């Protein structure tokens, strides 16, 4: 319930933050919230990808022992049908499609995480179009993943709900970025843009 409420608030802020009718203080608060949402999202996604998700594709010896143990405990506790099948420790169906999505996460998304994290910290406006492209791509890839978790056989209601609560933010937050980027010409109002082009436009 808390996750759903947070998601609803984030989407509402993303949609409403573009409106000219908002007073400057309210608009500033919305922008600050979305900026910090992005910083936290990308900053936490980097270690999650490198230490957890990458284990589905790369050999075990490249990961520290604590990371391997953490994933083992996660699979044992929540019986994640996707990660367990990807790691060869169970699963009821062929998960090659899931491995292909993990590959795109490592090859495409991971480099973008560093770029986006820098852009959000430094308030770089050039991130808007790449952010929309990223958000649309990731939102689409999360649909089959959530569908698999929702319909997987042999998964108890409690574990299914817990897994969905963990995975759903990785659909919703990118979707919020899409809405935000499409509704705003400048994401970080009053922030620093790339090369100061906004300032030159005002003075020309």
Predicted features and spans:
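Juxtamembrane helix-break-helix junctions at the cytosolic face
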Residues: 113-128
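Non-cytosolic membrane-interface motifs at loop->transmembrane helix junctions
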Residues: 154-166
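Interhelical loop segments of eukaryotic multi-pass membrane proteins
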Residues: 57-80, 188-198
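Hydrophobic cores of alpha-helical transmembrane segments in multi-pass inner/ER membrane proteins
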Residues: 169-180
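Hydrophobic alpha-helical membrane segments
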Residues: 109, 133-148
């Amino acid at each position: 319930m808390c996750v759903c409420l947070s998601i609803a608030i984030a989407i509402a802020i993303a949609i409403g933050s573009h409106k000219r009718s908002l007073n400057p203080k309210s608009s500033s608060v919305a922008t600050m919230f979305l900026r910090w949402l992005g910083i936290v999202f990308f900053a936490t996604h980097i270690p999650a990808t490198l230490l957890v998700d990458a284990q589905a594709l790369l050999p075990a010896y490249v990961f520290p022992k604590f990371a391997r143990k953490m994933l083992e405990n996660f699979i044992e506790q929540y019986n994640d049908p996707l990660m367990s099948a990807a790691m060869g420790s169970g699963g009821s169906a062929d998960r090659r499609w899931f491995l292909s999505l993990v590959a795109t996460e490592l090859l495409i998304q991971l480099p973008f995480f560093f770029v986006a994290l820098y852009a959000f910290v430094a308030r770089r406006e050039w991130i808007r179009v790449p952010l929309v492209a990223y958000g649309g791509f990731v939102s689409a890839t999360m649909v089959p993943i959530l569908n698999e978790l929702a319909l997987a056989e042999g998964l108890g209601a409690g574990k299914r709900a817990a897994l969905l609560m963990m995975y759903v933010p990785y659909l919703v937050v990118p979707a919020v970025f899409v809405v935000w980027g499409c509704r705003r010409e400048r994401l970080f109002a009053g922030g620093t843009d790339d090369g100061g082009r906004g300032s030159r436009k005002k003075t020309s």
